[in-house]
Amino acid sequence: MNLRRAVLVAIAVSFAAVDLVHKSFAAADYHHARTPVAALVMGGVIVALVVLVPRISSNAAAVGAGIACGGALGNLVSLLAWSGGVPDPLLIGRTTGVAFNLADLFAVSGDMLLLSAVAVHGVRHRHELGQRV
């Protein structure tokens, strides 16, 4: 469990660093607003994933949670560090498009991997689901 937690944290810090370096060099015309509620939610999600996911005996779940935490951590640091809010340098569409950043991509892809890994783990260990803890 401790090794999975260490892997999760290492992946999260690596992905957050990639996101922050990208945000510092990319020009961004769009920004998320700075809200304390968003910072609290992101911090809570990061803590919950770091505490709970390593209890699952799945390395893929730890990797997925690490990627998702990296995205959340990247947005959290951006939210706290940049006065204009979270920069969104990536844009799809010109006037009515979607603006996002690498942290958003990391959070979504990490969540997809985490949910897939938990589903596969649940199917593989379905015989244990009825047992008392």
Model feature map: region roles:
Residues 1-133:
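Alpha-helical transmembrane bundles and membrane-interface segments of multipass inner-membrane proteins
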